A protein has these predicted regions:
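Extracellular calcium-associated, cysteine-rich motifs in secreted modular proteins
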Residues: 1-186
Length: 186
């Protein structure tokens, strides 16, 4: 270092001096791939070097294993809830399914921890124990069955229950207002 009297040695040949109190000091004197740590987290600023910091200006994050831009440290700034899946990074409701509905295991209901799937896309969740469950998870035209007879309440849907409050009747083929089940009510 002919123009810098504070440095005189560079053991790893990276262009940064070995004197820790000198100008442009090398924090890794035996590693030519790293020399500085801007955020003081112990990981070098060169992201492609040994123990490189993916977030050189954030002391709470240093690794991003899946490369989605969210750090792997769960206690750091903007943590990645799914550090091994680049298609997911957050889980607002804590149900284990990612908020990105188009990603792997996407949550159809990112603000409801009791529901995550809706296979028929009718807006009602498939988890029967959750909020607003779909009584017919594979049929998009039906979602509720008030009387529990297996026929849906939506009159415009498939296999509609013509008597949604009577579990003994569901069909009225002739439209006379009386159910077709001879053993049922009315």
């Amino acid at each position: 270092f002919p123009t810098d009297s504070t440095q005189w040695s560079d053991m790893d040949g990276d262009g940064y001096g070995d004197n820790p109190t000198g100008n442009n000091a090398d924090l890794w004197t035996n590693d030519s791939s790293q020399w500085f740590d801007s955020d003081g987290d112990g990981y070098g600023d060169n992201p492609t070097g040994t123990n490189g910091d993916a977030f050189p200006n954030d002391g709470t994050q240093w690794s991003d294993q899946d490369g989605d831009g969210f750090g792997d440290n769960p206690n750091g700034t903007n943590p990645d809830a799914f550090p091994n899946d680049a298609t997911q990074w957050s889980d607002s409701d804590g149900d284990g399914y990612g908020d990105n509905r188009n990603g792997n295991n996407g949550d159809r209901f990112p603000n409801d921890g009791t529901q995550w799937s809706d296979q028929d896309n009718d807006g009602y969740g498939d988890n029967q124990a959750g909020n607003n469950p779909d009584a017919f998870p594979a049929e998009g035209t039906q979602w509720s069955d008030t009387d529990g007879d297996g026929y849906g309440d939506n009159q415009g849907g498939k296999e509609a229950d013509r008597f949604p409050n009577d579990n003994t009747q569901w069909s009225d083929i002739d439209g006379d207002g009386y159910g077709d089940n001879a053993n049922g009510n009315n």
